Amino acid sequence: VRHLNEKKTDSTMIAQMQLNIHLADAADKVCREFVQNDSTIYAMDDFGFWYAKTISSTSSDSIQQGQEIPLHIQISEIRGTLISDIKYQYIMGSGELPTAITRSLKMMCIGDQMHIVAPWYTAYGVEGTKIIKPYSNLFIIITIEQ
């Protein structure tokens, strides 16, 4: 009996993985279309999100691991509805932000602003948050304030 249950679990996991691959492909298509229709010129990160530095400060001080930085983060659904607009102190490397934001911060200096087009798997994933639905593709503006 145990052996049969293990096979069922394996097939359930495989089905879930296949579904997530399909959903990731669909998210990539939506994000690519957004980027192609926007006037901003984006680059694609190895993890699958798109980014564009829209304000470059004169500072050359990159953000260091453990450094506390003042952030302004605006998160919208990719189709335009603003979900969140917050300012707070973030400790670089604390792990509380999704991949698309933390990887973008590593490319920024104090005073910079970056636009991010994030498919769900680089944003808040399959679980979402209290205000962001699971599998949400997002447009994010992050500013490291001075």
Regions found by a protein language model. Name each.
Residues 1-146:
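Cross-family detector of peptidyl-prolyl cis-trans isomerase
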